[in-house]
Design a protein with these regions (language model features):
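C-terminal recognition in membrane/secretory proteostasis and scaffolding
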Residues: 77-110
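Conserved acidic, small-residue-rich alpha-beta core segments centered on
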Residues: 1-88
């Protein structure tokens, strides 16, 4: 299995990818993740507003914190702004997506 990540992958998404890699269940392909290693709790205030506070820290199954460093992919595949925009617009076909193609190639080589 391959898991695609980038700088928009954070929190539970990056810990999911890290856990799969630590259990040798997946290779990680793409760009470095954000490194948001904390979880928050939202406290409601009497006036109807709210405040979110970090109340804990995530760790991978092997006890590694990704806070402020994220995950470095096994296969690093940076994409330019034009490709990123096409991905988010839904106009990039998988055959032209460099990260998907790198993942397919990496899986074929296993």
């Amino acid at each position: 299995m391959a898991v695609l990540v980038n700088g928009e992958s954070y929190s539970a998404a990056e810990f999911f990818a890290a856990a799969l890699r630590e259990y040798d269940a997946a290779i990680v392909v793409g760009e470095q993740t954000t490194g948001k290693g904390y979880f928050q709790y939202t406290y409601m205030l009497p006036d109807g507003s709210a405040v979110g506070l970090s109340t804990g820290k995530y760790y991978t199954p092997n006890g590694v914190s990704l806070a402020q460093k994220g995950i470095m992919p096994d296969v690093m595949v940076p994409v330019d702004a034009e490709t990123t925009n096409a991905i988010y617009a839904g106009t990039l076909v998988p055959e032209a997506d460099p990260q998907i193609q790198a993942a397919v190639k990496a899986l074929a080589e296993e």
